[in-house]
Amino acid sequence: MSAAPPNGNKIRLATVWLDGCSGCHMSLLDTDERMIAVAQRADVVWGPLVDAKEFPENVDVTLVEGAVSSEDDLERIRRVRNRTRILVSLGDCAITGNVPAMRNKYGVDAVLRRAYLENATLDPKIPLDVIPALLPVSRPVHEVVPVDVFVPGCPPSADLIFSVIGELLEGRIPNPAAKFG
């Protein structure tokens, strides 16, 4: 499996943000001017700030930040996996569930009650009309869909992210056994 398209064109790169803090995307931005070299060989076709309504077809590489915690996350990651050749779990939330999974031992109802009813608020109600339907537990990405590459860290360093992207641009898959460093 290679990230490089067979026709020699630029790779189609996407990033996805599920249930996480955006720290992994901040580390990606911390690659600074090195992203210019990436931009010469990859087109960013999707990301949290891209003004597109639907995740595109035929994506070569997708970096996924965050755990799968809601029905929306589950639907999104399945669609992304179906449209992506190489899926990268970026950061500890995507790899282990990390902070989003801390709620798992309490259950959805207890977490929503604590967050919206028991804390000081002017309007104590659970805003079910605006929050996505939570899954019973928050799960790492690989428990829901197959993952090809794991990039650990909370967040992973900019150097590690750039190294992984560099390997993918060269048509090499970083060793998935390096999941935990």
Q: What are the roles of these predicted feature ranges?
A:
Residues 2-181:
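Iron-sulfur-associated redox domains of electron-transfer enzymes in respiratory
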